[in-house]
From Swiss-Prot:
It comes from Azospirillum brasilense. Residues 141-369 form the Sigma-54 factor interaction domain. Signal peptide: none annotated. CDD domains: AAA (cd00009), REC_RcNtrC-like (cd19928). This is DNA-binding transcriptional regulator NtrC. Keywords: Activator, ATP-binding, Cytoplasm, DNA-binding, Nitrogen fixation, Nucleotide-binding, Phosphoprotein, Repressor, Transcription, Transcription regulation, Two-component regulatory system.
Length: 481
């Protein structure tokens, strides 16, 4: 990488100093400023090979400056940093032409890596959309944890594409919110968003629901009916709980993805389709493939870009933000204004949340509606959590219990839950997967996403670790712990 002139704009002197030292060690010339007007003057004078800019500065928002820079110097790469770690910030940075978005606090090694990629990239900067900056300020996703930051960055990169996305995650993690965000802030935002839940439709009607049917196609088909593909033309089709789709319908869906056309049930004329497919499931599709319940070729067609949503227990630092968000929603809907004291909030952060964000939202709505006190305390929260169903209660682990004993205890409970029946086939792989995922994920977290160090820690070959990361759909967040 040859030496370059890098322009840094940030009103935090400490950040300017750190970036100057780090980039100068690599041989670059670094010019820094604490305001947007000076940065604009340098750019207008033709200075700089790369820009690193903050969003909030005393005189102007850094995001608002990007379109002006792109008009006079379209080839200039821009890296955006921000402490406003929301999906909106990431999307606005991407749609206005930023090369990369980094949330604060950032990892210095990651920033240096992004700088190297920006200076060495031969790919022309993405064209600015005609309606850039139209995104509203309503936040479809809440959270500033490292796991959510990585998801925001992935989503921002996908907004200008039509790539097929499959979202995985436990029930209640917000899979449909992600699908709607991909639509609402993407290139098909002016088209329809059509959702269909495979688990909620009788198996024999799924093909008719998806592709429509002709009059007389089957008993009771007294009129022609349009399917979801036709309804979603020009927009996004969200296939929720794709793991519950029958094999016959999977075959027809695969043909649509391969050929870009379909026929209605009972019809013969091919119909061209123009939709973006976003799928979601709480099930393990690879296990379903091994069990012969899901087509492997369809899996690879759908999982062009896989996104795994973490359960709430893996991002408990987001609980206070979510609680405040739901309380604000309640007050906006006419319920009394409430707050939650710190001991109660700490208890909510310790809870396991088997129902994830949906369970937390329901709890907050109950607190807002059923209790008269303005400040909700620990006693109220404890009472509410105690009233949840047994399956939703946090499991207290016996003190000093070893891993082997804990696994044995959980497996005994698992077999006992089936009473006289037996669990479904493939139990060995399912149990190993449940152990492997947290083991590898936590090892990567401990090594700040460094796969070489994680492989050494685990005693695995680096290629073996990479394959397991891919097979287990583990998201690697580099430089964060």
């Amino acid at each position: 990488m040859s030496a370059a002139t890098i322009l840094v704009a940030d009103d935090d002197r400490a950040i300017r100093t750190v970036l100057t030292q780090a980039l100068a060690r690599l041989g670059h010339e670094v010019r820094t400023t604490g305001n947007a007007s000076t940065l604009w003057r340098w750019v207008a004078d033709g200075q700089g090979d790369l820009i690193i800019t903050d969003v909030v500065m005393p005189d102007e928002n850094g995001l608002d400056l990007i379109p002006r820079i792109k008009k006079i110097r379209p080839d200039l790469r821009i890296i955006v940093m921000s402490a406003q770690n929301t999906l909106i910030t990431a999307v606005k940075a991407a749609e206005r032409g930023a090369f990369e978005y980094l949330p604060k606090p950032f990892d210095l090694k990651e920033l240096v890596s992004v700088v190297e990629r920006a200076l060495n990239s031969n790919t022309p900067p993405a064209a600015l959309p005609a309606d850039a900056g139209e995104a509203d300020e309503q936040l479809p996703l809440i959270g500033r944890s490292p796991a959510m930051q990585e998801i925001y960055r992935v989503l921002a990169r996908l907004m200008g594409t039509d790539l097929t996305v499959t979202i995985t995650g436990e029930s209640g993690t917000g899979k449909e919110l992600v699908a709607r965000a991909l639509h609402d802030y993407g290139k098909r935002r002016n088209g329809p968003f059509v959702a269909i839940n495979m688990a909620a439709i009788p198996r024999e009607l799924i093909e008719s629901e998806l592709f429509g049917h002709e009059k007389g196609a089957f008993t009771g088909a007294t009129n022609r009916s349009t399917g979801r593909f036709e309804q979603a033309q020009g927009g996004t089709l969200f296939l929720d709980e794709i793991g519950d789709m029958p094999l016959e319908a999977q075959t027809r869906l695969l043909r649509v993805l391969q050929e870009g056309e379909y026929t209605t049930v009972g019809g013969r004329t091919p119909i061209k389709t123009d939709v973006r497919i976003v799928a979601a499931t709480h099930r393990d599709l690879r296990t379903l493939i091994r069990q012969g319940l899901f087509r492997e070729d369809l899996f690879y067609r759908l999982c062009v870009v896989p996104i795994r949503l973490p359960p709430l227990r893996e991002r408990t630092e987001d609980v206070p933000l979510l609680v405040r968000h739901f309380l604000n929603q309640c007050s906006a809907q006419g319920l009394p204004v409430k707050s939650i004291d710190q001991p109660a909030m700490d208890r909510l952060k310790r809870y396991r949340w088997p129902g994830n964000v949906r369970e937390l939202e329901n709890l907050v709505r109950r607190l807002a509606a059923l209790y008269s006190q303005e400040v909700i305390g620990l006693d109220v929260v404890e009472a509410e959590l105690a009233d949840t169903t047994p399956a939703a209660q946090p499991v207290e682990e016996p003190q000093g219990e070893g891993l082997s004993a804990a696994v044995e205890r959980h497996l005994k409970d698992y077999f006992a839950a089936h009473k006289d029946g037996m669990p479904s086939n493939g139990l060995y792989d399912r149990v190993l997967r449940e152990v492997e995922r947290p083991l590898i994920s936590l090892s990567l977290s401990a090594t700040r996403g460094n796969q070489i160090k994680a492989a050494q820690l685990l005693g695995l070959n680096r290629n073996t670790l990479r394959k397991k990361i891919r097979d287990l759909d583990i998201q690697v967040v580099r430089g964060l712990k």
